[in-house]
Amino acid sequence: MNKDVLQGQSIIRYEEGQLIQTTDSYVTEFPLTINVNGTEFATVICSPTHMEELVVGFLASEGAIYKKEEIKSLQIDDSKGFAHVELTKDLGDRFEYSTKRMIASCCGKSREFYFHNDAAIAKTSMSKITLTPKQVLNMMTGLQTASTLFKQTGGLHNAAISDGDEFFEHRQDIGRHNALDKLYGFCLERRIPVRNKVLIFSGRISSEILLKAAKIGVGVILSKSAPTTLAITLANDLNITAIGFIRDGSFNIYSHPERIKATE
């Protein structure tokens, strides 16, 4: 069950020299505490939709599971803000220090956890996908068209997964990492192969977002914004094509340009 993503409130708006009373929509920020095998694992600040996909994708991106079948049971109690997960295996000692973490909607995890765990889980892409410039531009246009809640609030991150021609699904969330985890969970639940897929993302490609793409296993990530220097380094090391500044019929290729073919 999903709670309301948007809420309305009466506000005062200044416009054209006047203060006007009106109603505005804003996004819901929902804390979801994930308990794994009876132990508190993390609290994720998220938009309260597709929460089962979020939990599955989050656990996979943390390396707690590798496939959906490793989850024996998963129950969402959205009235209290808990996800109760029972795995078919123990988590192991390497997760002991990472329990009870707060994953905020605005940022990623601490640098310590990023280097200790995230980089170890990231996979070097073996993707054979190739794309034309037209496909790149069309995918970003498609993401912007699908981002209905962002148009209403300006407060959500958007992500989609595609084979270059067709969108398989898109997700929106107050947290940029959550949008990708929801897509990851969607693919795991439906056993969708991701090696030759593309991630389309509304935000900046940071090192953490690039690592998230590597964990998911895609070979290409697209964004309307620019990547960071560490993200470019990681993209080159992990054989991922990172493309940014997709706007007005142009884009920049920052790593592994061999996947983009100029001929239409």
Curated annotation (Swiss-Prot):
Signal peptide: none annotated. PANTHER family: FORMATE DEHYDROGENASE (PTHR30592), SULFUR CARRIER PROTEIN FDHD (PTHR30592:SF1). GO terms for molecular function: sulfur carrier activity; sulfurtransferase activity. GO terms for cellular component: cytoplasm. Its main location: cytoplasm. GO terms for biological process: Mo-molybdopterin cofactor biosynthetic process. Belongs to the FdhD family. Gene3D superfamilies: 3.10.20.10, Cytidine Deaminase, domain 2. It is found in: Cytoplasm. This is Sulfur carrier protein FdhD. Required for formate dehydrogenase (FDH) activity. Acts as a sulfur carrier protein that transfers sulfur from IscS to the molybdenum cofactor prior to its insertion into FDH. It comes from Staphylococcus haemolyticus (strain JCSC1435). Keywords: Cytoplasm, Molybdenum cofactor biosynthesis. The active site is at residue 107.
